[in-house]
Amino acid sequence: MHLPSLSLPLAALTLATPSLAYPYYRTEQPLQNNLAQSRANTIKEAFSHAWDGYKKYAYPHDELHPVSNGYGDSRNGWGASAVDALSTAIIMRNATIVNQILDHIAQVDYSKTNDTVSLFETTIRYLGGMLSGYDLLKGPASGLVRDSKKVDMLLTQSKKLADVLKFAFDTPSGVPYNNININTHGNDGATSNGLAVTGTLVLEWTRLSDLTGDDEYAKLSQKAQSYLLKPQPASSEPFPGLVGSHISIETGEFTDAQVSWNGGDDSFYEYLIKMYVYDPEAFGEYKDRWEAAAQSSMEHLASHPSTRPDLTFLASYNDGKLGLSSQHLTCFDGGSFLLGGTVLDNDDYIKFGLDLVKGCHETYNATLTGIGPESFAWDPNSVPSNQKALYEKAGFYIQSGAYILRPEVIESFYYAYRITGEEQYREWIWNAFVAINKYCRTSSGFAGLQDVNAANGGGRYDNQESFLFAEVMKYVYLAHSGDAEWQVQRGNGNKFVFNTEAHPFRVR
């Protein structure tokens, strides 16, 4: 999950043709075959291309500007792209890049920055990236780095970072400030925090406690989470499990009852089921709340465009009215239902998750570039005159046509592929990668697009978000590489669980 506001500053590949319908629970196709291996190598080349451009033009800054070959420091100048790339480089077994990143992390001083720090973004990218690297290099990738001190450093740096950040939780309620000044221990004066921003800390901070033996970090994040699990006032929960979008920092009470799975709310729901995967015994209440939210979403938020009743999207809800719009960010939802369905052995969740995946696939399949837009809608009373044909054919119209290298659609395709074994979903992943490689690739990396439904993407944004490395490249590669401990598994066989930045953590 990332906040919804836009931060703007290979060789010829053939598209695979997807089948029209997906069989349910077909036996998984063999992962290791010549085509998959060839594609995996192409994906690794794309990752290395982006890394080489970042290393040449932007390192040690946060991100590359891949059109001008400049750089940006949107994440405090600690080298966000490097830290975010670590777990993907490990999974690709690229020891050269892994060691370059470890050398970088060792010299980062997380106590120094002149800019406001986002507790949320810093947790999911930096803390998540380092903890995941530690789990992977201490576990299934233990032979990749010979110097164990380099690996141990990841945990040391993780603890140092959390110690810099933890004052954010020092509020009357324990609900943290998000935008903080680590030099003065100040904040932006906000009176409330967002649902996802508050509810997407618990996995990383709990994992840190488990690895260090210091329970302070888990207690801080779980105290904040407690207000989200037992929402007050009752009016902030219009349907069981579905809660408002903002929480008072003073009292821990919700300040509204606006419900959605969109950006700003999304990863709260994502982490409910993932905490259960992390430890089913300790986090049974989180599972119960996810199930309540899932059931309510199926009953009250599921929406079908008038021109494409075969498609399913999740609407938002506020004050008795449904909002018939959604976002690229929201398209993680299919993966969440699929994960919950397989872990809880519930075919209804799996079927609904696949319906959501199909809807989000249409947002890619129907555009000129084959890439989905930042935001879209299906309100039949608000269709722009110049998009009526699109709405008639595809069941949605575009509100913002930007693409800033987001991963959520591919992420849900990955869950669909791993959980059903149906080859179609891997083809959808490949098609998306081919389109991104065609329209976003520059001489030094990958750039965002201004309009996915315009010729050549309507121009490029001169920015390469760090989550290109952490998420897009990882999910595409995982779908084309062999089975491994870190892969999503059917049923209760998961040895790892992914944070919202696609960094895999070892489960308890």
Curated annotation (Swiss-Prot):
User: Which pathway does the protein contribute to?
Assistant: Protein modification; protein glycosylation
What does it catalyze?
N(4)-(alpha-D-Man-(1->2)-alpha-D-Man-(1->2)-alpha-D-Man-(1->3)-[alpha-D-Man-(1->2)-alpha-D-Man-(1->3)-[alpha-D-Man-(1->2)-alpha-D-Man-(1->6)]-alpha-D-Man-(1->6)]-beta-D-Man-(1->4)-beta-D-GlcNAc-(1->4)-beta-D-GlcNAc)-L-asparaginyl-[protein] (N-glucan mannose isomer 9A1,2,3B1,2,3) + 4 H2O = N(4)-(alpha-D-Man-(1->3)-[alpha-D-Man-(1->3)-[alpha-D-Man-(1->6)]-alpha-D-Man-(1->6)]-beta-D-Man-(1->4)-beta-D-GlcNAc-(1->4)-beta-D-GlcNAc)-L-asparaginyl-[protein] (N-glucan mannose isomer 5A1,2) + 4 beta-D-mannose; N(4)-(alpha-D-Man-(1->2)-alpha-D-Man-(1->2)-alpha-D-Man-(1->3)-[alpha-D-Man-(1->3)-[alpha-D-Man-(1->2)-alpha-D-Man-(1->6)]-alpha-D-Man-(1->6)]-beta-D-Man-(1->4)-beta-D-GlcNAc-(1->4)-beta-D-GlcNAc)-L-asparaginyl-[protein] (N-glucan mannose isomer 8A1,2,3B1,3) + 3 H2O = N(4)-(alpha-D-Man-(1->3)-[alpha-D-Man-(1->3)-[alpha-D-Man-(1->6)]-alpha-D-Man-(1->6)]-beta-D-Man-(1->4)-beta-D-GlcNAc-(1->4)-beta-D-GlcNAc)-L-asparaginyl-[protein] (N-glucan mannose isomer 5A1,2) + 3 beta-D-mannose
Signal peptide positions on this chain:
1-21
| Keyword terms | Carbohydrate metabolism, Cytoplasmic vesicle, Disulfide bond, Glycoprotein, Glycosidase, Hydrolase, Metal-binding, Signal
Active-site annotation: E374 (proton donor)
Cellular component terms, GO, for this chain's entry? cytoplasmic vesicle lumen; endoplasmic reticulum; membrane
Family matches, as InterPro entries: 6hp_glycosidase-like_sf, Glyco_hydro_47, Glycosyl_Hydrolase_47, Seven-hairpin_glycosidases
Q: Where in the cell is it found?
A: Cytoplasmic vesicle lumen
Q: What is its EC number?
A: 3.2.1.113
* Cofactor list: Ca(2+); Mg(2+)
- Sugar attachment sites are N94, N114, N365
Please give the Gene3D superfamilies that the UniProt record associates with this protein.
Answer: 1.50.10.10
Q: List the disulfide bonds.
A: C331-C360
Question: In the record's cofactor note, how is the cofactor described as bound?
Answer: Ca(2+). Can also use Mg(2+), but with lower efficiency.
Record GO biological process? carbohydrate metabolic process; ERAD pathway; protein glycosylation
Sites where the protein binds Ca(2+): T500
One GO MF annotation is:
calcium ion binding
Q: How does it assemble?
A: Monomer.
Identify its protein family.
Belongs to the glycosyl hydrolase 47 family.
Q: What does this protein do?
A: Involved in the maturation of Asn-linked oligosaccharides. Progressively trims alpha-1,2-linked mannose residues from Man(9)GlcNAc(2) to produce Man(5)GlcNAc(2).
This protein is called: Probable mannosyl-oligosaccharide alpha-1,2-mannosidase 1B
Q: Which organism is it from?
A: Aspergillus terreus (strain NIH 2624 / FGSC A1156)
Q: Which gene encodes it?
A: mns1B
